[in-house]
Regions:
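Generic macromolecular interface patches on structured domains
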Residues: 55, 87, 143-147
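Short, flexible loop segments at the rims of nucleotide/cofactor-binding pockets, characterized by
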Residues: 16, 62-64, 142-146
Length: 166
């Protein structure tokens, strides 16, 4: 039910999620081999989808609301409209105490927050490149969502202009 209204975010986030996941877990020698979870939420902080290399304590449908699970990067990034990183000891929710999460908002140029793009890792696997990667990925998804919104507006206008001219 939560996923139905988020097709635009899911469709545009999927290729970016796969790229980030492959970069972190794939067979080459860069930052590879990291145990991670790459995820996307909707504008209410509901986890829509994830890619993980092993079981992590999040699942689709989970709500990243501070009132429910305490301090978390998803809620913080959407509230502050800026990337947020929360380290293990900063999590109120005990299941997250061994993890670090970086999340950044998916925002279109009209100022609408559509969700968040994040990476969750074990604390020992974290370095600052993960924060940068989350931020760049959210901006890429934001750009794709923005293009899709403009495309649908343009198609709507063209459909109605044709009707008006005829």
């Amino acid at each position: 039910a939560c996923r139905s209204g988020n097709g635009l975010v899911l469709a545009n986030a999927a290729p970016i999620m796969h790229s980030v996941f492959e970069l972190l877990t794939g067979p080459k020698e860069d930052i590879k081999g990291v145990r991670c979870c790459v995820f996307v939420t909707d504008s209410s902080g509901v986890l829509l989808t994830k890619l993980d290399s092993q079981p992590f304590p999040i699942r689709p449908g989970m709500v990243f609301d501070e009132r429910l699970i305490g301090t978390n990067s998803v809620h913080s990034c959407m509230e502050n409209r800026y990337i947020s990183t929360v380290y293990g000891f900063e999590h109120y929710f005990e299941e997250f105490s061994g993890y670090v999460a970086s999340a950044a908002p998916i925002i279109t140029e009209d100022g609408v927050v559509h969700g968040a793009f994040g990476v969750l890792l074990h604390c020992g696997d974290y370095d600052l490149s993960i924060k940068a990667m989350s931020d760049v990925a959210s901006k890429a998804v934001s750009s794709l969502v923005n293009s899709s919104v403009h495309r649908s507006h343009r198609e709507f206008l063209l459909d109605h202009i044709d009707d008006a001219i005829i």
